[in-house]
A protein has these predicted regions:
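A structural signal for multi-pass alpha-helical bundles of membrane permease subunits
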Residues: 1-226
Length: 226
C-alpha cells in the first residue's frame, strides 16, 4: 500500500502541477474549453467510466502482440499496478481534476514578472518551471501530495477494479498486489459471513481496530508535513 500510494502521489503531484501551470500561464486556443473538461471530470461518478477503463487495461495496446502472454500476464494489465500508474502519468487518476484546479488557481496568483525576469536571464519555459515556479510552489505541492496519498491509501474502488485477484488472501501469487483497504474489506466480509450473533461485538471490535491501524500512517504523515 505504501509503495503504490507513494508512487501514485509523487507522479500525480508533478503532473497536476505541470498541467495546472499550463492552464494558468499559457493562452492557447481551446484553453477555456479544456479546463471545463477538467472540471467535468470532478463531477462524473467513477462508476460512469468503470467498464470502459477496465476494458482498456484488460485489452491494452500490446495485448494483440503476445507480449503479455510471454510475461505471464493473461489478463492484460489487470492485477498489476500499471493501470493506476498510467492513469497518474496522464492526469486521469482519482481526484486529479481537483488537483489540476488547485494548482491552476495557485499559479494564477504568481506574478508574471517572475517568469519575465527569468526569460530575460535566458531561461526557457521548462527551466523557468523547474527552477523558479516549483520552488515557490512547495506548500501547495505538499498539500496536493497529502491529499493524493491519503485518497490512494484508502482507495478500494480502483484497486478492486484493476486488481480483482488481490481480493482473496488465499492466492499467494496475488499477495504482493494486496493493499490494506482491500485486506480490511476481506476481513470484514469474512466476519460478516462467518460471525454468529454472539460474535458480532467481537467482529465489530476487530474491524474498527483494523480501520484505526490503517489510518495511523496518514496521521503521522500529516503531522510530519505540517
Amino acid at each position: 500500500t505504501f509503495l503504490l500510494s507513494g508512487i501514485c502521489a509523487l507522479i500525480q503531484t508533478f503532473i497536476c502541477a505541470f498541467i495546472g501551470y499550463g492552464f494558468a500561464k499559457f493562452k492557447f486556443k481551446g484553453n477555456g474549453f479544456m479546463f471545463i473538461v477538467v472540471l467535468v471530470t470532478m463531477m462524473l461518478p467513477h462508476q460512469f467510466m468503470e467498464a470502459s477503463m477496465y476494458l482498456k487495461f484488460r485489452y491494452f495496446i500490446l495485448d494483440s502482440t503476445g507480449i503479455y502472454r510471454a510475461l505471464g500476464l493473461t489478463t492484460g494489465l489487470i492485477n498489476t499496478f500499471a493501470p493506476l500508474i498510467i492513469l497518474s502519468l496522464t492526469g486521469l487518476a482519482f481526484k486529479n481534476g481537483l488537483f489540476v484546479f488547485i494548482m491552476r488557481q495557485f499559479y494564477r496568483g504568481v506574478p508574471d514578472e517572475l517568469e519575465e525576469s527569468s526569460y530575460v536571464d535566458g531561461y526557457g519555459v521548462f527551466k523557468t518551471f523547474f527552477y523558479i515556479i516549483l520552488p515557490i510552489s512547495v506548500p501547495m505541492l505538499i498539500t496536493v501530495f497529502i491529499l493524493s496519498f491519503s485518497w490512494q491509501w484508502t482507495d478500494t474502488f480502483y484497486v478492486n477494479m484493476f486488481m480483482p485477484g488481490s481480493n482473496t488472501l488465499l492466492l499467494t501469487s496475488s499477495r504482493f498486489w494486496q493493499t490494506m483497504p482491500t485486506t480490511l474489506e476481506t476481513i470484514k466480509n469474512a466476519q460478516l459471513i462467518g460471525a454468529s450473533n454472539a460474535g458480532d461485538i467481537y467482529a465489530v471490535a476487530v474491524r474498527n481496530t483494523a480501520g484505526f491501524l490503517v489510518i495511523i500512517p496518514l496521521i503521522i504523515m500529516y503531522l510530519f508535513c505540517q
